[in-house]
């Protein structure tokens, strides 16, 4: 809101508040003057204190208005930071007004003064308005800034936006339970039945006591006891059914959340996985989703049950004694405020705990997945120490949570104790004065204990919900994330020749935005031909493969497949016609048959066997105990490096792809196996366009075209003999290998390491 509007509205209300309160006070004291009322003030008879409270809150609002008007930049921020002040003022005045009503009731039974009731009601109206106006002043912007587009709302610090965000997250979370509406309706029915049964129990307990103490009737006592038993049995049965249904509903919610999150993750662009650690993603997928469903299910169940119980309890409490009910409600606003403060703090801590746990999970996942490397360097103890340090960070946050919970329980428990002592003392006064029976007092005290338990549960529900919402926000952050690279191509021709053209391709990884990996790279792959990429480590060979697989978007240029941009092809179709075999292929924990046919809907077993024979894998597969049904283990751990490469080669060949990419695909094979695979590929070239990255001279020299890369640029192209005749980089690489100075056609032997989540191979 614009500044002048907020100031005008606030000043108008302050004037009206002072005017109305003064008028009511004057009409209620026509028989004496203000000075006489001040000199002979009697808290049981005068409303001068309520008029003084009006002046105090008006001065507070005037001060806030002046502060915002004089400094429209810092003023609203200061008001947002001091929201606790106006909350405490409104709370204290509201409690004092209730106490005033009780004091008046002691000398005026009943209270028939209309001016007192008018001032009593107006006090609460003005308190609510004062609180809202304080929030209004805290959201204003300078007039010039308010006129700018996009500045209509408040987006700064403060509690309101955070509360709205939490509410929106909770609402969105509950929207995932829409398929289970029928279950929720049934659970709500049994919840109401159970809560109503529990609500009537104290009432009939009081009736049983009155039948003994007052009526002294055994029949009435027996009737009351039978009703109590029936209510207890019925409410227990309904509560059990309610709990079972809620557990089922939120188990389905957990599955739904995990499914949505996993689908969102696998649809993200490749750069997303370079920027996010695997452990963090696994933590979101497992611990966070479980925490969300468990905490939300438990706390919503408790919240709904206690809401119904509180409604019934309040009705019975007012029917038994409106005076004791007012005493009871004097303390609960304080408990609610403490719960609110604690819930916000706990929500922030919960987010930090989840992030710390995710970091610990990342460390554990990284260590366990590379256990052979850890053991080869005898670094087990150091890795355990690193993990312990991560856990200690979690423990520090847990200690803060424990301290916050201790303070919350102490504050709310002390307030509740004060309320209970006040009820007992004032209730005894009402019984002695004949305004209440002993049975009603006992019933009221039981109701007060029930109400206290309900409010305490609601307080813990709030903190639990905030913890669940904190985890849900992290889950929805990934569920709602839209991939920056969308695979929305539609081309899927029946016939594909397999010609590939790189035209002035410029490329940079998102994790290294200032390093150009490829610069104006141009070359072509011809159908029926073998093209080899060679060059030093980091020259851009593997990046060309990543681009051809459409893993990353380009910064410049384009890659064409049969004259069409690769992004124009259907995602499934593109990766059916382009197959990649990498140096360290990944196999899944499935059978060999499932690994070879991976990604294809239906593949005849004969085609699987044929592909395995071409890849020289059929022999070792048949020697395994279960043959093609043998489980490969996690990441193919049950197979050797050479066996994994041959299975991966079969996985590529079973598709009969027009374009075949071999990225050091035979590096782990013996000479005989490599020769057989090369013969299978070269003997069927009319059906493939082949791109190879290899460092063995025997593999490279047979290529129809050799493309030499250096520092992201194409420096030479030609056949083996042509490039040797030209001299240059390729001739140097060949000379180094022939002299035994370096094993591969590369400056750095063995550079082909798989890229980590934070680094890319080029």
From Swiss-Prot:
It comes from the Eukaryota. InterPro entries: AAA+_ATPase, ABC1_TM_dom, ABC1_TM_sf, ABC_transporter-like_ATP-bd, ABC_transporter-like_CS, ABCB9_6-TMD, P-loop_NTPase, Type_1_exporter. The record marks 17 as: Intramolecular salt bridge with Arg-57. Essential for the release from the ER. Residues 184-467 form the ABC transmembrane type-1 domain. ATP binds at residues 535-542. One of its GO terms (biological process) is peptide metabolic process. PROSITE patterns: ABC_TM1F, ABC_TRANSPORTER_1, ABC_TRANSPORTER_2. One of its GO terms (molecular function) is ATP hydrolysis activity. Found in testis, particularly in the Sertoli cells of the seminiferous tubules. Also expressed in kidney, brain, heart, lung, spleen, thymus, intestine and testis. Higher expression detected in brain and testis than in thymus and intestine. It is a multi-pass membrane protein. Its main location: membrane. It catalyses: a [oligopeptide](in) + ATP + H2O = a [oligopeptide](out) + ADP + phosphate + H(+). GO terms for cellular component: ATP-binding cassette (ABC) transporter complex; endoplasmic reticulum membrane; lysosomal membrane; lysosome; membrane. Its EC number is 7.4.2.6. Residues 500-736 form the ABC transporter domain. Keywords: ATP-binding, Lysosome, Membrane, Nucleotide-binding, Peptide transport, Protein transport, Translocase, Transmembrane, Transmembrane helix, Transport. Homodimer. Interacts (via TMD0 region) with LAMP1; this interaction strongly stabilizes ABCB9 and protects ABCB9 against lysosomal degradation. Interacts (via TMD0 region) with LAMP2 (isoform LAMP-2B). Interacts (via TMD0) with YIF1B; this interaction allows (but is not essential) the ER-to-Golgi trafficking and strongly depends on a salt bridge within TMD0. Divided into an N-terminal domain (TMD0) comprising four transmembrane helices and the following core domain (coreABCB9). TMD0 is required for lysosomal localization and LAMP1, LAMP2 and YIF1B interaction. The core domain is required for homodimerization and peptide transport activity. ATP-dependent low-affinity peptide transporter which translocates a broad spectrum of peptides from the cytosol to the lysosomal lumen for degradation. Displays a broad peptide length specificity from 6-mer up to at least 59-mer peptides with an optimum of 23-mers. Binds and transports smaller and larger peptides with the same affinity. Favors positively charged, aromatic or hydrophobic residues in the N- and C-terminal positions whereas negatively charged residues as well as asparagine and methionine are not favored. This is ABC-type oligopeptide transporter ABCB9. It comes from Rattus norvegicus. The gene is Abcb9.
